[in-house]
């Protein structure tokens, strides 16, 4: 058992873990919360849960590690602010949802509960029965304000935030990342609206892919030429088809769903949301990709080789997956935006690229290369709420062969990154 998991010993059921907004969420509509430094938490969708439980072994290094299931409810703190608190599931004897499937993560890697204060452990508090009645007027006003903020977010498709040189980047973004706060507030709103009928939800625990980076730069790409699942209503399917037709999804099988990148030249973080991503032309998509790998001073060329290597391997893996369809799934590309002295000069960057290729097999973690002198870079698939394959017995539609739309998007991505690499002089 790794030290990260060994630290989380069995905890009495009266304890809960305070869930916080995940400040590096740049896309998607599902609320992603921070469980602890290395673990995230998101609402359990049966289809996505089934995907992680039956995940093919060769795909594990391209997805976040699955860590189990918890029960989440909202409660008030001392200042009457609403908080989301996670608890172990009933009957799990302190361990977070043991899974018996042989294709899953080993039981030894599933999270256990602890009293360690740094994990934000709270005592259980009873939720006031009259909460809805007391706060109805107040919450109505907040809801109206929230709608105004979301409309502003749609209009402000690209935002900049100046990062202080001293201090932790995650703590600075805690109350700023617009997309993260939007998703968190929407989740609270949904749970509050159902307060009379339900105050207990299942969430899944997943690896925090950004935890190893000091200044995470994150690119969220919506993959494939089709986004709607087989179970989508006619209205939903038509809406998703329209979005694909009006974006780069229909042309190259991929579009920008969100971006967070550090501009070292100005000391700012740039955020790009999905509304801007939908408007990009193919050339605009290429420029956005170039911007993601550019730190405001120079192109991070030492990252391009490792990214291409990972994309090529992922493509080969998916070509072997029979009947899978990853509708509406995203692909994350992550690297550290922190400047490193040895990559300031172009000649140094070229040398580091050679080093990164030589040390590619010395990967740390699931699939994050950590070459000498260069930032590690990660490529992972996420969001499987609409994924299907013949293993899912309840599905009425069974597809044959590989997911051609997703693979087409991967090949387009490989081609564009290759173009950027060649045009930059490599």
Curated annotation (Swiss-Prot):
Inhibited by flavonoids, including myricetin, quercetin, luteolin, isorhamnetin, rhamnetin, kaempferol, diosmetin and apigenin. One of its GO terms (cellular component) is cytoplasm. Keywords: ATP-binding, Kinase, Lipid metabolism, Nucleotide-binding, Nucleus, Phospholipid metabolism, Transferase. One of its GO terms (biological process) is negative regulation of cell growth. One of its GO terms (molecular function) is inositol hexakisphosphate 5-kinase activity. It catalyses: 1D-myo-inositol hexakisphosphate + ATP = 5-diphospho-1D-myo-inositol 1,2,3,4,6-pentakisphosphate + ADP. It is an enzyme of class 2 (transferase). PANTHER family: INOSITOL HEXAKISPHOSPHATE KINASE 2 (PTHR12400:SF47), INOSITOL POLYPHOSPHATE KINASE (PTHR12400). Belongs to the inositol phosphokinase (IPK) family. This is Inositol hexakisphosphate kinase 2. It comes from Homo sapiens.
């Amino acid at each position: 058992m790794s030290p990260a998991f060994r630290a989380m010993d069995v905890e009495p059921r009266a304890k809960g873990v305070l869930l916080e907004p995940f400040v590096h969420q740049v896309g998607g509509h599902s609320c992603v919360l921070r469980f602890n430094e290395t673990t995230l938490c998101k609402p359990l969708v049966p289809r996505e849960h089934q995907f992680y439980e039956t995940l093919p072994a060769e795909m594990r290094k391209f997805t976040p590690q699955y860590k189990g299931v918890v029960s989440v409810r909202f409660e008030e703190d001392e200042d009457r602010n609403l908080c989301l608190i996670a608890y172990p599931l009933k009957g799990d004897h302190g361990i977070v949802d043991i899974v018996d499937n042989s294709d899953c993560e080993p039981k030894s890697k599933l999270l256990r509960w602890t009293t360690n204060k740094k994990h934000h452990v709270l005592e259980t508090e009873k939720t006031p029965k009259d909460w809805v009645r007391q706060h109805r007027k107040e919450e109505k006003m907040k809801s109206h304000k929230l709608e105004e903020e979301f409309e502003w977010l749609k209009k402000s498709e690209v935002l900049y935030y100046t990062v202080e040189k001293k201090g932790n980047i995650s703590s600075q973004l805690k109350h700023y990342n617009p997309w993260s706060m939007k998703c968190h507030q929407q989740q609270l709103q949904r749970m509050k609206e159902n307060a009379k009928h339900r105050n207990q939800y299942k969430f899944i625990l997943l690896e925090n892919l950004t935890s190893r980076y000091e200044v995470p730069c994150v690119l969220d790409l919506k993959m494939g030429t089709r986004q709607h699942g087989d179970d989508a209503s006619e209205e939903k399917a038509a809406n998703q088809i329209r979005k694909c037709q009006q974006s780069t999804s229909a042309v190259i099988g991929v579009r920008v769903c969100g971006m967070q990148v550090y501009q070292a030249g100005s000391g700012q973080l740039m955020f790009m949301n999905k509304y801007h991503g939908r408007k990009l032309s193919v050339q605009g998509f290429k420029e956005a990709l170039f911007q993601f790998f550019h730190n405001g001073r120079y192109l991070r060329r030492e990252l391009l080789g490792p990214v291409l290597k990972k994309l090529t391997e992922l493509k080969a893996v998916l070509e072997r997956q029979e009947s899978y369809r990853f509708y509406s799934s995203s692909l994350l590309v992550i690297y550290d935006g922190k400047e490193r002295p040895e990559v300031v000069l172009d000649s140094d960057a070229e040398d580091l690229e050679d080093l990164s290729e030589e040390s590619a097999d010395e990967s740390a973690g699931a699939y994050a290369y950590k070459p000498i002198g260069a930032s590690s870079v990660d490529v992972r698939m996420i969001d499987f709420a609409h994924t299907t394959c013949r293993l899912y017995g309840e599905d009425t539609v069974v597809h044959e062969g590989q997911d051609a739309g997703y693979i087409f998007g991967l090949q387009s991505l490989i081609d564009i990154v290759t173009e950027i690499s060649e045009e930059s002089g490599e």
